[in-house]
Amino acid sequence: MRTIIGDSVNKSTKLKSDRFRSMWDGKIKGEKYDSPDFSSGEVNGDVLLLRYNLYNDEFESKKTINGNTHFVERTLSKVVIYKTNKYFFLPYYYKGGKNFNVGYLSLITELDSIRLYRKDEVKFQPATFSPTTIEIGFPPRFIKRKLFFIQKKEATPIQIGKRKMIKLIESLSLDIELK
């Protein structure tokens, strides 16, 4: 014999799982690649087919369309040209200079004493279940964001906010559009 509390918990759990299944088709939303297709690019002057895995922050390469996929070696000496952008494998600091990382930064512009970079990042967000019908649950998904960095002379690049980057570009009278 079931109790009222036991029945309500089972019905509630079934309702949550049914609602989640109707929302999620079994696929992860979003894309971990900049583009899922390989595009022509260069690695230190060698012409290859490339695609950029934003989630793992690495380039995948092929010599031919039907060739095997290889990963571009992540060293400071490698310069990757992908979709007309130059990517440098550099150490950098996130905001506040607390978190240090090493990865690919895309050069926006280079002036006498400063370089401006952009970094496209993808973070994986696991599924969230809504405990009630009022709250919203989400399927697992990749979330894209753009970060901006400034490098003075040969110092380590440091993240700056988009507003500060726009003000800097305006103060330097540069004709650059932040995409």
Model-derived features: where do they sit?
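General N-terminal leader/first-domain-start detector
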Residues: 1-47
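Long, compositionally biased interface segments
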Residues: 168-179
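Aromatic-patch recognition
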Residues: 33-164
